[in-house]
C-alpha cells in the first residue's frame, strides 16, 4: 500500500510536470502548431471565446496554419485577435480561411526560445523542490508528534527524495525534447 504522504507528493509533482509540459506545448517554435492559438480569445457576441472553439485549426504545408471558422462572420474578429496578440504573425484573410505563415526563425530567435523554455522548466523544478520541502516538513512534524516512528520517517524522506529526483529528471527530458524541436531546421 502506498503511503498517503507519498501519494500526495506524487500527485502534486505530476500536476506540476503536466503544467510545465502544457506551457512548453503552447510555446512558439519554428513549426506551426494549433496549440499556440489556445490563449487567443475572440469577442464573440460579447463573450471572450478561444479561437479553437470558433474554427478548425490545421497545419497545411510545412510553415502554415489554416484557421477555418465555422461562421464566416468571425473571420475579421479572429484576424484582429491574432494581430492584437504577441505572436508576431500576420494573418492572411482570403474571405474563407485565415492563413498564418510562420517565417523561418533566425538562430537568435531560436536561442531566445530555448532560453524561455529553460526558464519555464526551472520554474517547474523549483515548484517540485517546494513540494518536497513542504512534504518533508510535514513528515518531521508527524514524527515529532509521535504519529510516525523515526525509521518510517527516514524511509519516507528517502522515497520523497527519489520521487523528486525522478520528476526533475523528467523535466530535464521534456526540456531536451523541446530544445531539439526549437533548434530543428
From Swiss-Prot:
Signal peptide: none
Protein's UniProt keywords contain Metal-binding: no
Major location category of this protein: cytoplasm
GO cellular component: cytoplasm
Domain of life: Bacteria
Transmembrane spans: none
BP GO terms, sorted: translational termination
Entry-linked InterPro entries: Ribosome_recyc_fac, Ribosome_recyc_fac_dom, RRF_sf
Locations listed in the record: Cytoplasm
UniProt keyword list: Cytoplasm, Protein biosynthesis
PANTHER family from the UniProt entry: MITOCHONDRIAL RIBOSOME RECYCLING FACTOR PSEUDO 1, RIBOSOME RECYCLING FACTOR
Family: Belongs to the RRF family.
Its biological purpose: Responsible for the release of ribosomes from messenger RNA at the termination of protein biosynthesis. May increase the efficiency of translation by recycling ribosomes from one round of translation to another.
Name of the protein described by the UniProt record: Ribosome-recycling factor
Organism in which the protein naturally occurs: Thermotoga petrophila (strain ATCC BAA-488 / DSM 13995 / JCM 10881 / RKU-1)
Gene responsible for this protein: frr
Amino acid at each position: 500500500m502506498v503511503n498517503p504522504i507519498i501519494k500526495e507528493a506524487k500527485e502534486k509533482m505530476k500536476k506540476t510536470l503536466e503544467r510545465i509540459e502544457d506551457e512548453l506545448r503552447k510555446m512558439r517554435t519554428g513549426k506551426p502548431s494549433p496549440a499556440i492559438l489556445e490563449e487567443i480569445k475572440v469577442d464573440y457576441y460579447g463573450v471572450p471565446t478561444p479561437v479553437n472553439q470558433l474554427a478548425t485549426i490545421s497545419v497545411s504545408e510545412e510553415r502554415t496554419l489554416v484557421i477555418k471558422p465555422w461562421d464566416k462572420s468571425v473571420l475579421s474578429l479572429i484576424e484582429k485577435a491574432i494581430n492584437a496578440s504577441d505572436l508576431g504573425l500576420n494573418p492572411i484573410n482570403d474571405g474563407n480561411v485565415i492563413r498564418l505563415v510562420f517565417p523561418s526563425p533566425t538562430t537568435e530567435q531560436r536561442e531566445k526560445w530555448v532560453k524561455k523554455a529553460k526558464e519555464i522548466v526551472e520554474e517547474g523544478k523549483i515548484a517540485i523542490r517546494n513540494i518536497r520541502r513542504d512534504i518533508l516538513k510535514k513528515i518531521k512534524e508527524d514524527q515529532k508528534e509521535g504519529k510516525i516512528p523515526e525509521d518510517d520517517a527516514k524511509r519516507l524522506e528517502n522515497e520523497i527524495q527519489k520521487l523528486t529526483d525522478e520528476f526533475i529528471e523528467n523535466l530535464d527530458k521534456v526540456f531536451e525534447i523541446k530544445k531539439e524541436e526549437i533548434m530543428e531546421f
